[in-house]
Amino acid sequence: MPATETADKNTKSANSDTSGRVVRVTGPVVDVEFPRGSVPDLFNALHAEITFEELAKTLTLEVAQHLGDNLVRTMSLQPTDGLVRGVEVIDTGRSISVPVGQEVKGHVFNALGHCLDKPGYGEDFEHWSIHRKPPPFEELEPRTEMLETGLKVVDLLTPYVRGGKIALFGGAGVGKTVLIQEMINRIARNFGGTSVFAGVGERTREGNDLWVELQEANVLKDTALVFGQMDEPPGTRMRVALSALTMAEWFRDEAGQDVLLFIDNIFRFTQAGSEVSTLLGRMPSAVGYQPTLADEMGELQERITSTRGRSITSMQAVYVPADDYTDPAPATTFAHLDATTELSRSVFSKGIFPAVDPLASSSTILDPGVVGEEHYRVAQEVIRILQRYKDLQDIIAILGIDELSEEDKQLVNRARRIERFLSQNMMAAEQFTGQPGSTVPLKETIEAFDRLTKGEFDHVPEQAFFLIGGLDDLAKKAESLGAKL
């Protein structure tokens, strides 16, 4: 193992077990005074024993700033109810650490590494600091291998990279969490490796639903879950992604495994950082975000990478505030990604699920040198037809479709079939739709859309293409509507 990684492991420093006193409490921000020469380092974890409503608990604080005069400003990772001036605070001499190892699979942890489904579990495991350096440049191994999902719209138009960073962008209520759960169902089942899920500032109910679904799918035994949901203080929501990533890094670096890392939602990580920055008194930057936004995002994203023979494949849901893609939070995320899947409200309103906007989504490996000439040609033809259809929308709305040329009429009819054929029943929605989820092999997807763009299915009614899988499903539905392929 490289020396830098060894240094990142959880080792105590010389000034451990030094105690200070609380001098100021402002919500989750706590100022602590230490004896001269014993001021803890930045990111050190401090412990304070408090009693609130007759319950004793240990409060964890993280050093965020050195104020001078032996004062440090800390951010609490738990509610500070019951914490008062004068309470003793112990410097642990190390940063926050989480348990790592094969035994963390099948369990739920919080940002501090405490097991939630089995209290006390994992305390005797090896612990790694959540603040680690990314792998050295010479160890990186960029990949261009495609990760097949079985979803037509993804595999054809925005192919995912194995060992890459993939993001699902969308506003409120367009299906980001459902699509993340769908990817867990599809990829984790077929992947056969280890998955780590980070619930960052999202709904507690969704975390519980995921836990139950993973149990039912028999995938939980290969999955570690780390939650810091929206009812937690901002310090926890800011650190939970790092805690989950640290567990994933152990599987990559020590076990030599390919790992899937799911993060829902990366925007909440940014939002928590903004709250922390304001509480610490920093001057806000654009749109009120923290001035350190790009730095914090980079520290997280640069650690999600592939090294020699091993990889972390990351899928991140990204909430887009008010559907504004120029907002600094989603805009900062874009720079780090290999593939983007954008979920659109206009596609959602048509009842097409997953509500992916094929013209706004992209992938770095949609290149003939990677996916092959045929895949690239078919994908570009589909995009061309959909783009031309979009360009004609205003003319159709004002003058009507009858004013178009015969060639454009044919293109519009073909585009409408393509739009509907990009929809698909999902495994994560089976309980709501009553329809089983479908998986379509990449080869069949390419063949089907190739035939569709060439006009072989122009005689098949539009409704035959809606929410189906591959060519067999299309043939059955077309036959039920009185048409043959």
From Swiss-Prot:
Pfam families found in the cross-reference section: ATP-synt_ab (PF00006), ATP-synt_ab_N (PF02874), ATP-synt_VA_C (PF22919)
InterPro entries reported in the protein's UniProt record: AAA+_ATPase, ATP-synt_VA_C, ATP_synth_F1_bsu, ATPase_a/bsu_AS, ATPase_alpha/beta_chains, ATPase_F1/V1/A1_a/bsu_N, ATPase_F1/V1/A1_a/bsu_N_sf, ATPase_F1/V1/A1_a/bsu_nucl-bd
Known EC number: 7.1.2.2
Subunit structure: F-type ATPases have 2 components, CF(1) - the catalytic core - and CF(0) - the membrane proton channel. CF(1) has five subunits: alpha(3), beta(3), gamma(1), delta(1), epsilon(1). CF(0) has three main subunits: a(1), b(2) and c(9-12). The alpha and beta chains form an alternating ring which encloses part of the gamma chain. CF(1) is attached to CF(0) by a central stalk formed by the gamma and epsilon chains, while a peripheral stalk is formed by the delta and b chains.
GO cellular component terms given for this protein: plasma membrane; proton-transporting ATP synthase complex
Family, per entry: Belongs to the ATPase alpha/beta chains family.
Annotated positions binding ATP: G170, G171, A172, G173, V174, G175, K176, T177
Region called Disordered, residue ranges: 1-20
Basic and acidic residues biased stretches: 1-11
GO terms, molecular function: ATP binding; ATP hydrolysis activity; proton-transporting ATP synthase activity, rotational mechanism
Topology of this chain in the membrane: Peripheral membrane protein
Location in or out of the cell: Cell membrane
Class in the EC hierarchy, top level: translocase
Source domain of life: Bacteria
Gene: atpD
CDD domains linked to this entry: ATP-synt_F1_beta_C, ATP-synt_F1_beta_N, F1-ATPase_beta_CD
Keywords: ATP synthesis, ATP-binding, Cell membrane, CF(1), Hydrogen ion transport, Ion transport, Membrane, Nucleotide-binding, Translocase, Transport
Record's function text: Produces ATP from ADP in the presence of a proton gradient across the membrane. The catalytic sites are hosted primarily by the beta subunits.
Source organism per UniProt: Mycolicibacterium paratuberculosis (strain ATCC BAA-968 / K-10)
Catalytic reaction annotation: ATP + H2O + 4 H(+)(in) = ADP + phosphate + 5 H(+)(out)
PANTHER family named in the record: ATP SYNTHASE (PTHR15184), ATP SYNTHASE SUBUNIT BETA, MITOCHONDRIAL (PTHR15184:SF71)
Protein name: ATP synthase subunit beta
